[in-house]
């Protein structure tokens, strides 16, 4: 991510106003606004596959799945992030809002440039959301999905699913999705050997 300005402070309201008129997505961290670069093809296919898998399973559940363009509000408005996908089952998260306050599940498709942030500081911030039950990381270099599930004791339990034969159990939504569905149409080993790991900045 690249800071929009290294000088001065933007209030949350400043950020939301600027973002409503911007053609480029930005994240907001403690008064600074950071531009986000576009994603690559592998990233988009994985995100789209996961969105379709969730949407088809959640249609009559009262939960909604959002894809890429909806922010999550954190730290009482001091931070706003754009996850690749999120699911909210809280009626207070109206579809007309520009951001979600009560996500149940957040999903990030990993890229080489942001994997450290997604696993580290961003996950640390997401864990402050009482509504969040699961944080899911999807690898774009190999067939691997990591599900971090919050326990009743407020610990986070990791379950990893590897290989196209595996089925990811998303307990927070009471559903399971085969990795073959998440990675549909992708031959990752061949693609990674050909072009290397994608370097988008989402």
From Swiss-Prot:
Q: CDD domains in the record, alphabetically?
A: DUF820-like
Please list the disulfide bridges: none
Q: Belongs to which family?
A: To Synechocystis PCC 6803 sll1609 and sll0925.
What is the protein name stated in its UniProt record?
Uncharacterized protein sll0925
Q: Which organism is it from?
A: Synechocystis sp. (strain ATCC 27184 / PCC 6803 / Kazusa)
Which taxonomic lineage does the organism of this UniProt entry have? Bacteria, Bacillati, Cyanobacteriota, Cyanophyceae, Synechococcales
